[in-house]
Amino acid sequence: MATTQVELVTPTGTLFSGQAEMVVCRTGGGDIAFLADHMPYIGTLEAYPLRIVHPQGAAGDELRFEVGGGFVEVSNNRVIVLCDSAEPA
């Protein structure tokens, strides 16, 4: 499966930077999943678990982070998550 570059950033630093098959989060409009080559998107994040699904065959299936709200931007096969706070779930 194709991958997309993912950046998970908080005011204290970058918690994740790497390739993923999918990113799942809750926005102001509901739950959404971003795959490779997703159309451009900008939205607000709700406080909710964020899932980063690793490429097939990578160690571990997915990462989960409890995010405390923020923003998500998708463009040029890249997902950038800017959040107030995030901790591994």
Language-model-derived ranges and their functions:
Residues 1-3:
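Short, charged, intrinsically disordered terminal tails
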Residues 5-89:
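Compact, glycine-rich, soluble single-domain proteins
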